[in-house]
UniProtKB/Swiss-Prot annotation:
Subcellular location: Cytoplasm
Pathways involved: Carbohydrate degradation; pentose phosphate pathway; D-glyceraldehyde 3-phosphate and beta-D-fructose 6-phosphate from D-ribose 5-phosphate and D-xylulose 5-phosphate (non-oxidative stage): step 2/3
Protein name: Transaldolase
Reaction equation(s) it catalyzes: D-sedoheptulose 7-phosphate + D-glyceraldehyde 3-phosphate = D-erythrose 4-phosphate + beta-D-fructose 6-phosphate
Species assigned in the record: Carcinus maenas (Common shore crab)
Predominant place of localization: cytoplasm
Length: 75
């Protein structure tokens, strides 16, 4: 695609040719993840929704063995 007659006349063409394949691969990755956002995926998935009240939250924190360590680290 790029055919410079001399590398010294236009070295940017050589660099463009080198990175062209890498650019196309990154476009494929971008288009793959652009299809569906994480929020859409989670809202459509069959993930269990949690009903969380303050009392439930405190109970869950007491059940968590590492919650005490987290409080110590915050101080």
């Amino acid at each position: 695609k790029y055919k410079p007659t001399d590398a010294t006349t236009n070295p940017s063409l050589i660099l463009q040719a080198k990175f062209l394949e890498e650019l196309q691969n990154s476009k494929k990755i971008y288009n793959y993840y652009k299809k569906e956002s994480v929020v859409e995926h989670l809202s459509e998935s069959s993930a269990k929704k949690l009903e969380m009240t303050e009392a439930n939250f405190r109970w869950e924190m007491n059940e968590d063995k590492f919650a005490v360590d987290a409080v110590k680290l915050e101080k």
